[in-house]
Amino acid sequence: MMVAATFLDVFVMNKPSIHIAMPCYDSVKIHTMISMLKIVKELTMAGLKFELNTMKSPYVAYARNILTARFLQRDEDYLLFVDSDLEFEPECVLKMLIAQKDIMCTPYRVKTNDPASTKYTVSIEDPKNVKILQGGLVEINNGPAGMMLIKRTVFEKLIKDYPEKEIKVHPNEDTFPKDLRIYNFWDCNFKDGTWTGEDIYFCDLARQSGFKIYANIDSTLIHHGSFGYKGKYGDSFKPKTNGTNGTKN
């Protein structure tokens, strides 16, 4: 598949701009950097405007809030979150851009002690009656933010709907520009005995504001840890088979 040509064919008229944001704990996996080099090459060849921003923090929710604020200071059309331990091909980003949805993610396997486990952190309204849309899309309630594409208009509406989410005082504020307006759109939550991560918090917030969330089920991602957890979300809708999909790094 000639990804660069496809980018050109689809976006030559409006050329969406992309702000790639990567929360980092203490490092970036080499597999992720190779993937980034691939997507940078394709975006450059297509003539699309983009930039890459990183944020080093042990608190992923905090890093996502800072990266979102930096995105809103710019004028790009899309915010693309890419976690620092994901391996992907450019076609994954291409599929999400082509879909032109307000919020779209590509799910990846959860790291577990069992490399054969194929668990995904995705919530669907009716898992027994999943409607696969054209382009390999599925509407979901929430999904992981490690590979998530979000339109600027989503955040603009969230700011209007939830002005109280603005963070007035935050740690290390002297290290950020005074005009950086940070909103708590990403946060962990604990309710009715259940703890949820910052991506579920964001998805719930967005859905309350009227947005729909979609998952790209046709792209294969590798979630790197002690093992490389390779998987395509669409395979979870197929009959189960025996086998191991984890490879030791």
Predicted regions and their residues:
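N-proximal low-complexity "stem/linker" segments adjacent to membrane-targeting elements
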Residues: 2-57, 62
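C-terminal catalytic/acceptor-binding lobe
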Residues: 11-13, 162-249
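Anion (oxyanion) recognition and catalysis
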Residues: 44, 97, 207
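Residue-level detector of anion-binding/catalytic polar loops
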Residues: 49, 85, 102, 212, ...
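Residue-level recognition of beta-strand->loop/alpha-helix junctions
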Residues: 54-56, 107, 217
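Active-site nucleotide-sugar/metal-binding loop of Leloir-type enzymes
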Residues: 65-78
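Conserved catalytic core of nucleotide-sugar-dependent glycosyltransferases
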Residues: 68, 89-187
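Short beta-strand-to-loop acidic/aromatic patch adjacent to the donor-nucleotide binding site
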Residues: 76-87
